[in-house]
Structure formats: structure tokens, C-alpha cells
Amino acid sequence: MRTVSKWVLAMGAAAAMIASVSPSQAQQTIRVGWTIPAEESKYWMMRRPSEFSDLGKTYNVEWTQFQGTAPMTQALAAGALDCATQAPLSLANGVVGGNLKAYIVAQHVFEKPGGFSVYWAVKDDSPIKTIADLKGKTVGISVIGGGTQGPFNMLLKQAGLDPAKDIKLVEVGFAVSEDALRQGRVDAVNMNQPFAARAEAKGGTRKLFSLSEAMPNIVHILEACRADFVDKNPDLVKAYVRDITSGMKKALANREETLKVVSEVLKAPIPVLDTYLLKDNDFGRDPGAAPNFPAIQKMLDIYAQTGMLPKLDVAQFKHPTIVAPLQ
């Protein structure tokens, strides 16, 4: 009952938070949640809408930014969003705790061998040398209950720590994670691009552990839409998924323009982005934004094995026809 009550309160808050952006023409408008970083296809749609044949013509998007995937899950469950960026864990928590029914229609990024893996950093002079040394410390995470917390909890447990009792976990957005660490507000904090590259260039921090140590080939973020919205508006959602597909292709085909687009959205200098974006040391991206359902199933299975979720079948998230790539 405690979980359900928390979800009811959260869904009410999510609905109230973005009630002001309710669409005037629901049949032609999709309310979409987004976050940073690593949603290049959506950033292209936001910043270069004229590049898309349907966007702004046959349908519109009302964009709402969130700090992470968990609040967007709550907004989807509350009916306050139609589609949004999700992580496998946050989406699954919405199904279990919020009675959310949704389809995975596209995928944004995943961790590839040799590429970037989200990691936790400490100061160079910190006495923290191992995960076990985090006991009693204040640790920052982008969003509590978000996609990174699953493998994070697994790594803590493997080191003999209880994630609920042995550390103080606080929310620190990726954009301010470096400042929080350098100012001593946290003892360790998670790092994502481009903020990791910026911190590494300045020096004075070091990597403690990365998520790939717990779960290789993580599917970090995907695009999900409420099932009832998809079922009622199949042509509208198809147009949206076609543009997600097109956006991914544009992002990969024109790196120079993608650097400009991402810089505009993230407010990050192009020279910083140029050190990693769409290079071998970045996340992986499917060229057609196709969801890797087998990889997502493996993640759900691991979460079930560790007691974080009940057993779930990824098939419930797959629409028979509305899924990237769509032409």
C-alpha cells in the first residue's frame, strides 16, 4: 500500500505540474517529456523542426523538460504526458506501481563495449578507494528511482552495502554533479556526458566505478508512449515515430550539425562535445532508433533476480506495427 500511495501522490503532482501545457487540439498534438543528455533525435526535432516532413504540419509536439526518467514515468501514468523518455527500470516501476500501460516505440542510447559508461566519481584526494568505502557517505544520483539506480544498487550490494541503509542517497542533476562534488556537498556523484568530459578536462576527480561493471550493454533510455494514446491515435504516433527514426538518421549522418543542435539544447561548448559526441567513446545508437527488446528483457530479468521487480515480459511493451524504424 505504501508504494501505491506514493505513486498516487506522485501522479497527482506530475499532472498538476504540466497541466498548463494541456494541448488545445489533442488529436493533433503529442505531449512529450524529454531530458538531458543523449536524446539527439528529439533535439533535432526541437531545434530543427523544418527538417521534418510531418512535424508542425500534420501534428505538433508540446515539449516538457524533466530532470530524469522517473518523474516522466509518473506523468505518463497520470495521463499528463503522451510519450516520454524512459529507462527500462523506471518504465517497469510505472507498470508495477502505477498501473501504467505503455509501448516502447524507439530507443535513444545504450552502452556499447569500449564506449562510455555512466560512472560515479570522487575527488582525487578522497579517501574513498572502493565501493565499500561509500558506507556512511553522501552519494549523488541524477534521479532516485531512475534508470541508473538499478545497476547502482546491484554494485552496492555486491560490495556488501545496503543501498537503503548504508549510504545517504541524494538527487543531484547531471548538469550540477561536478559542482556538487568539488564543493563537498556529496562524497561521490554520478557523471554523464558532456559533464563528465568537462570535469575530466579540469582534473581533480577520478572514476570510482561504472555501471558497466554491474550490467554490460545497458539500454539507457528509450521512447515510450501510453498504450491508450497509441491505440486511439495510431496514425499520429506513427508520424511521431517516423520523425524519431528520421531524427536519429540525421543526427548520425551530419555530426557537424548535430554538435550545434546538442550545444543549443545542453548549453555546452562545441569543443567539449567534440571530445566524445558520436565518437567511439560515446554511447551506442541504433541507426534506425530500433529498440533492443532482447537486451531490455535481460535487464528486466536481472532486476527480477535481484528482487527489484517482479518478473516481467518485455513483449507487453511491443506494439505489433508502431515501433522504430518507421519510414
Locations of the language-model features?
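Sec/Tat signal peptide C-region and signal peptidase I cleavage site
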Residues: 21-26
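Bacterial N-terminal signal peptides that target proteins for export
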Residues: 1-11
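Pocket-lining segment of extracytoplasmic ligand-binding domains
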Residues: 89, 98, 175-264
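Conserved C-terminal helix/tail region of periplasmic/extracytoplasmic solute-binding proteins
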Residues: 300-327
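Short, glycine-/small- and polar/acidic-enriched structural segments
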Residues: 28-161, 168-171, 187-193, 217
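Secondary-structure end/capping motifs
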Residues: 231-308
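Soluble non-cytosolic domains of exported or imported proteins
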Residues: 66-70, 85, 142, 146-147, ...
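Bacterial N-terminal signal peptides
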Residues: 9-19
